């Protein structure tokens, strides 16, 4: 998320904590539990080391050696973006594979991007978009055949609309 965008407020629940951990692992290179704890504290989430350890274990987070040799936490097949970096090449390739067969049209409308899919595919497409750290995207809402991508502003929506269309066209 950009520093100019609205900050995400989270309730003090386990689900919100797990979501914050997942978001931190997707947007930062986390090399230790203490580093992750500091990031969570910055987001207003206080957590003990024991709880953090259990959460990471439950999420199947593992330490993985990155291309530059750094050992950092990752979850499953998540694509770790560097600070300030958007979706990486691998993340775009994963998104493109999904979007290519499932997106029938894309249009910007205000700060929203409206993505149409075949019947029954919208929630899957929304999930793929939500799992990537996409600059300027706050989240998605999915119905049966339509996904609304909520962006921080109108210009970002136009940019992300074109970007999603290009991914779907690869």
UniProtKB/Swiss-Prot annotation:
**InterPro entries assigned to the protein according to its UniProt record, in alphabetical order:** Arg_repress, Arg_repress_C, Arg_repress_C_sf, Arg_repress_DNA-bd, WH-like_DNA-bd_sf, WH_DNA-bd_sf
Instruction: Cite a GO CC annotation.
Output: cytoplasm
Pathway field of the UniProt record reads:
Amino-acid biosynthesis; L-arginine biosynthesis [regulation]
Q: Which biological process annotations from GO are given for this protein? A: L-arginine biosynthetic process; protein complex oligomerization; regulation of arginine biosynthetic process
What does the record give under GO molecular function? Answer: arginine binding; DNA binding; DNA-binding transcription factor activity
Q: One Pfam family from the UniProt entry?
A: Arg_repressor
Q: What does this protein do?
A: Regulates arginine biosynthesis genes.
KW Transcription (keyword) present: yes
- Point out the coiled-coil segments of this chain: none
Q: Give the SUPFAM superfamilies listed for this entry.
A: C-terminal domain of arginine repressor, Winged helix' DNA-binding domain
The main location is cytoplasm
Q: What is this protein called?
A: Arginine repressor
Q: Which family does it belong to?
A: Belongs to the ArgR family.
Q: Which UniProt keywords apply?
A: Amino-acid biosynthesis, Arginine biosynthesis, Cytoplasm, DNA-binding, Repressor, Transcription, Transcription regulation
- What taxonomic ancestry is recorded? Bacteria, Bacillati, Actinomycetota, Actinomycetes, Bifidobacteriales
Domain of life (superkingdom): Bacteria
Query: Could you tell me where this protein is found in the cell?
Result: Cytoplasm
């Amino acid at each position: 998320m950009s520093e100019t965008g609205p900050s995400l407020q989270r309730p003090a629940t386990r689900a919100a904590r797990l979501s914050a951990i997942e978001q931190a692992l997707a947007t930062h290179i986390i090399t230790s539990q203490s580093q992750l704890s500091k990031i969570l504290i910055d987001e207003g989430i206080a957590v003990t080391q024991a709880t953090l350890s259990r959460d990471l274990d439950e999420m199947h987070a593992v330490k993985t050696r990155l291309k530059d040799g750094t050992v950092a936490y990752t979850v499953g097949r998540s694509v770790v973006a560097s600070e300030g970096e958007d979706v990486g090449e691998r993340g775009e390739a994963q998104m493109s594979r999904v979007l290519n067969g499932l997106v029938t049209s894309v249009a910007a409308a205000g700060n929203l991007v409206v993505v149409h899919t075949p019947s029954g595919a919208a929630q899957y497409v929304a999930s793929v978009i939500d799992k990537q750290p996409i600059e300027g995207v706050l989240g998605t809402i999915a119905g049966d055949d339509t996904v609304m991508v909520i962006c921080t502003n109108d210009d970002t929506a136009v940019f992300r609309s074109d970007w999603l269309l290009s991914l779907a066209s690869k």
